[in-house]
Amino acid sequence: MAYDLIIRGGTVVDGTGCEPYVADVAVTGDRVVAVGTDLGEAEKVYEASGCYLAPGFVDIHTHYDGQATWDQEMAPSSWHGVTTVVRGNCGVGFAPAAPDRHDWLIGLMEGVEDIPGSALSEGMSWNWESFPEYLDALEEMPRAVDVATHVPHGAVRAYVMGDRGAANEDPTESDIASCLLYTSPSPRDVVP
């Protein structure tokens, strides 16, 4: 079988915990299809002797929540071998988002992460309100990396509690019940 690409003689660190080993890696399309020795021919062959080959890295703590709406590459993470990013960390994010809370959510993100609010304001289209609508907006854009997300509790509190949530007031029992709806195992079922 002829592959699109073979990377020959690299030291493979496969993430399973086994010792690194020297092998060839064959790629067809955008998939690794074989790892071993003497894999045959390919349209392109790269010699990787002295180099390490590893699966893509998963960055479990990012704040790409806004950038994900305009940057297909998730730069600079994708430039450094990251193939999956997780967002919604530290309780900050941009959904659910009532229209009158956009600036507050941007300020919250700006305070947690050194991301200029002006970049977020100019970059985001805000073509969503609910968390499912946010996910739909993200799915419309092709990506260089996979994305996963937490439902950010700061956005949920502000959405459910309005000014009281933004002011960090204690939630009522009713507020907690409403917040739980937005953090259910299937937030796609909760649309305002």
Each predicted region: which residue ranges?
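Histidine-rich, glycine-flanked metal-binding segment
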Residues: 2-8, 12-56
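Activation segment
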Residues: 16, 36, 66-68, 86, ...
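Short capping/connector residues at structural and topological boundaries
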Residues: 17-18, 58, 69, 161
